[in-house]
């Protein structure tokens, strides 16, 4: 007996990340190889023709799991009964644009989308914000959807997590799949703090294997934090395939579970680790039965506290910059 189809809403569907994402979702990479999906694609009126072109390609793949596609410029149509919502579309920063202008332009978008989710999405909708500034955009959407549980709103730090894993694997000479107990704290921005103090590789203590605090502070942390900029510099375009891959990892783990492995998600704070309530902040979680659970009780040393507070202060500044727009 085939499972009933899940409705997956994707915003910014005509964009680069969307193009890398949609075919993999339709192929079952995100929700499982036995889970039919209906894609509900949102983009701006001027992007509708481009989205329709992507839909033609989706049709031409004849994916067995693709049970339907909706294309719209209306958030209430895109989010109708959505089980998963990937909020990829956001206003990019243009030349000469101040960060505060970027914040308010995105606050407008994510207020509208939060309200639409509140009105029409499934009450169990799993929301992942990819569009930057992701943590604050997730906070805005959450605050605009008072009838949905706060825990349904998450921001993507999985790209940072995966970037950190790959750097650690290269440095330690261990397979990337063998590294466990990594966490990336804070904001999806260069202030994030990738922390491998308790991480292991093939069961061995990773700090002992690497044994290079100078590398950690002066190479590893800045490399992970500035990787996005390095890709733009090299390619002339921002990272799209790796961002789409991280979004799929994030949702797959949230829905299907992590088998006890730690992953990083940006989630609304419950006050633990000194993070004020509701701030969407990257922490280590494990997932099972469609729910995430933060890893509690990690020891925070002085260096870590400083790094965690630094990224928190940036998030508080962003929150204060949009607070007046949230009614």
From Swiss-Prot:
<dbReference type="InterPro" id="IPR001236">
    <property type="entry name" value="Lactate/malate_DH_N"/>
</dbReference>
<keyword id="KW-0520">NAD</keyword>
<dbReference type="Pfam" id="PF02866">
    <property type="entry name" value="Ldh_1_C"/>
</dbReference>
<protein>
    <recommendedName>
        <fullName>Malate dehydrogenase</fullName>
        <ecNumber>1.1.1.37</ecNumber>
    </recommendedName>
</protein>
<feature type="binding site">
    <location>
        <begin position="12"/>
        <end position="18"/>
    </location>
    <ligand>
        <name>NAD(+)</name>
    </ligand>
</feature>
<feature type="binding site">
    <location>
        <begin position="130"/>
        <end position="132"/>
    </location>
    <ligand>
        <name>NAD(+)</name>
    </ligand>
</feature>
<keyword id="KW-0560">Oxidoreductase</keyword>
<dbReference type="Pfam" id="PF00056">
    <property type="entry name" value="Ldh_1_N"/>
</dbReference>
<feature type="binding site">
    <location>
        <position position="113"/>
    </location>
    <ligand>
        <name>NAD(+)</name>
    </ligand>
</feature>
<feature type="binding site">
    <location>
        <position position="93"/>
    </location>
    <ligand>
        <name>substrate</name>
    </ligand>
</feature>
<dbReference type="GO" id="GO:0006099">
    <property type="term" value="P:tricarboxylic acid cycle"/>
</dbReference>
<keyword id="KW-0816">Tricarboxylic acid cycle</keyword>
<dbReference type="GO" id="GO:0006108">
    <property type="term" value="P:malate metabolic process"/>
</dbReference>
<dbReference type="InterPro" id="IPR015955">
    <property type="entry name" value="Lactate_DH/Glyco_Ohase_4_C"/>
</dbReference>
<feature type="active site" description="Proton acceptor">
    <location>
        <position position="188"/>
    </location>
</feature>
<feature type="binding site">
    <location>
        <position position="163"/>
    </location>
    <ligand>
        <name>substrate</name>
    </ligand>
</feature>
<dbReference type="InterPro" id="IPR010945">
    <property type="entry name" value="Malate_DH_type2"/>
</dbReference>
<feature type="binding site">
    <location>
        <position position="106"/>
    </location>
    <ligand>
        <name>NAD(+)</name>
    </ligand>
</feature>
<dbReference type="InterPro" id="IPR022383">
    <property type="entry name" value="Lactate/malate_DH_C"/>
</dbReference>
<dbReference type="GO" id="GO:0030060">
    <property type="term" value="F:L-malate dehydrogenase (NAD+) activity"/>
</dbReference>
<dbReference type="InterPro" id="IPR001557">
    <property type="entry name" value="L-lactate/malate_DH"/>
</dbReference>
<feature type="binding site">
    <location>
        <position position="99"/>
    </location>
    <ligand>
        <name>substrate</name>
    </ligand>
</feature>
<dbReference type="InterPro" id="IPR036291">
    <property type="entry name" value="NAD(P)-bd_dom_sf"/>
</dbReference>
<feature type="binding site">
    <location>
        <position position="132"/>
    </location>
    <ligand>
        <name>substrate</name>
    </ligand>
</feature>
<comment type="similarity">
    <text>Belongs to the LDH/MDH superfamily. MDH type 2 family.</text>
</comment>
<comment type="function">
    <text>Catalyzes the reversible oxidation of malate to oxaloacetate.</text>
</comment>
């Amino acid at each position: 007996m085939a499972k009933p189809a899940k409705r997956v809403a994707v915003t910014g569907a005509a964009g680069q990340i969307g193009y890398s994402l949609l075919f993999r979702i339709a192929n079952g990479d995100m929700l499982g190889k036995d889970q039919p999906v209906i894609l509900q694609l949102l983009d701006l009126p001027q992007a509708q023709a481009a989205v329709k072109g992507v839909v033609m390609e989706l049709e031409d793949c004849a994916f067995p799991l693709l049970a339907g596609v909706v294309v719209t410029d209306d958030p209430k149509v895109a989010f109708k009964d959505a089980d998963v919502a990937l909020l990829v579309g956001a206003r990019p920063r243009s030349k000469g644009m101040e960060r505060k202008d970027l914040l308010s332009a995105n606050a407008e978008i994510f207020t509208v989308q939060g309200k639409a989710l509140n009105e029409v999405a499934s009450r169990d909708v799993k929301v992942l914000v990819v569009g930057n500034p992701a943590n604050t955009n997730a906070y805005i959407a959450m605050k605009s959807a008072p009838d949905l549980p706060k825990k349904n709103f998450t921001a993507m730090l999985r790209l940072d997590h995966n970037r950190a894993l790959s750097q650690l694997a290269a440095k330690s000479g261990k397979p990337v799949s063998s590294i466990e107990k990594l966490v990336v704290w804070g904001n999806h921005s260069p202030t994030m703090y990738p922390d491998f103090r308790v991480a292991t590789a093939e069961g061995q203590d990773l700090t002992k294997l690497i044994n290079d605090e100078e590398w950690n502070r002066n190479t590893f942390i800045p490399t992970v934090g500035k990787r996005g900029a390095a890709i733009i510099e090299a390619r002339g375009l921002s990272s799209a395939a790796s961002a789409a891959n991280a979004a799929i990892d994030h949702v797959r783990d949230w829905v299907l579970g992590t088998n006890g492995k730690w992953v990083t998600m940006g989630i609304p704070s419950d006050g633990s680790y000194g993070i004020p309530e509701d701030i969407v902040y990257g922490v280590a979680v494990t997932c099972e039965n469609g729910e995430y659970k933060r890893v509690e009780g990690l020891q925070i040393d002085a260096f870590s506290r400083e790094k965690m507070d630094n990224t928190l202060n940036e998030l508080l500044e962003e929150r204060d910059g949009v607070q007046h727009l949230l009614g």
